[in-house]
Curated annotation (Swiss-Prot):
Protein name (record): Small ribosomal subunit protein bS16
Recorded superkingdom: Bacteria
GO cellular component labels: cytoplasm; small ribosomal subunit
Natural source organism: Clostridium botulinum (strain ATCC 19397 / Type A)
Family indicated by similarity: Belongs to the bacterial ribosomal protein bS16 family.
GO-annotated molecular function: structural constituent of ribosome
Key words of the record: Ribonucleoprotein, Ribosomal protein
Length: 82
């Protein structure tokens, strides 16, 4: 099973916020996921990023590939990926 860390879109029309989830790469964007590891709200000023550092480290260690957007969010949140 190819596992990715990616964004799941939530919220209302024109007012999105995103949950950062670990999901099978074959699942739809807003479909089934394995675990929720945080959220991202681009609407607030400044935008809100909250990630569970332990879960991020665990999933990267177990081989989950973060998408490009999630990589940027991890860097912005100040989490060092070993």
């Amino acid at each position: 099973m190819a596992v990715k860390m990616r964004l799941k879109r939530m919220g209302a029309k024109k007012a999105p916020f995103y949950r950062v989830v670990v999901a099978d790469s074959r699942s739809p964007r807003d479909g089934r996921f394995v675990e929720e590891i945080g959220y991202y709200n681009p609407i607030t000023e400044p935008s809100t990023i909250k990630l569970d550092e332990e879960k991020v480290q665990k999933w990267i260690k177990n081989g989950a590939q973060p998408t490009d957007t999630v990589k940027k969010l991890i860097e912005k949140a100040g989490i060092s990926v070993k």
